[in-house]
């Protein structure tokens, strides 16, 4: 392999993203599609770019991502987490900046399971006194 690449795994909700950073022009590819083609919402695109913009590495790396599971929000968060981990592998001095922004910490919030005898995780069926 001629060019050096950096790898990071990111997780959020039920999404798992595998991220490779290679020195390049700044193209972001998600599941063999461009970022604009893969994500429709502007907020999802912004979340994906956040760690690169914070560390001023926007045009320095080409980002290749394979992401599975979850929805748009979870996948975007997983990609951001993976990019952050890959950036740390590339340059450990970025740790302080990324930690302060809260990008290194894995967001452990997941959907609460539905309980039996209830309509949802916490919602009850409608109660009638009479």
Swiss-Prot record:
Gene Ontology terms: biological process: translation
Keyword Ribosomal protein: yes
Top-level taxon in the UniProt lineage: Bacteria
InterPro entries recorded: Ribosomal_Su5_D2-typ_SF, Ribosomal_uS9, Ribosomal_uS9_bac/plastid, Ribosomal_uS9_CS, Ribsml_uS5_D2-typ_fold_subgr
Listed PANTHER family: RIBOSOMAL PROTEIN S9, SMALL RIBOSOMAL SUBUNIT PROTEIN US9M
Lineage of producing organism: Bacteria, Pseudomonadati, Thermodesulfobacteriota, Desulfuromonadia, Desulfuromonadales
Protein name per Swiss-Prot or TrEMBL: Small ribosomal subunit protein uS9
One Gene Ontology term of the molecular function aspect: RNA binding
Similarity comment: family membership: Belongs to the universal ribosomal protein uS9 family.
Organism whose genome encodes this protein: Pelobacter propionicus (strain DSM 2379 / NBRC 103807 / OttBd1)
Statement: the UniProt record of this protein carries the keyword Ribosomal protein: yes
Entry GO terms, CC: cytosolic small ribosomal subunit
A Pfam cross-reference name: Ribosomal_S9
Keywords: Ribonucleoprotein, Ribosomal protein
């Amino acid at each position: 392999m001629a060019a050096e690449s950096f790898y990071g795994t990111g997780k959020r909700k039920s999404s798992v993203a595998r991220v490779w950073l290679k020195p390049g022009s700044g193209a972001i590819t998600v599941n063999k599609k461009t970022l604009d083609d893969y994500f429709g919402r502007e907020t999802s695109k912004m979340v994906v770019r956040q760690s690169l913009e914070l560390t001023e590495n926007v045009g320095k790396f080409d980002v290749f991502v394979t992401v599975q599971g979850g929805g748009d929000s979870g996948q975007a968060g997983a990609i951001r987490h993976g990019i952050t981990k890959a950036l740390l592998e590339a340059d450990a001095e970025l740790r302080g900046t990324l930690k302060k922004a809260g990008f290194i910490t894995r967001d452990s919030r997941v959907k609460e399971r539905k309980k039996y005898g209830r309509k949802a995780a916490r919602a009850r069926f409608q109660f009638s006194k009479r």
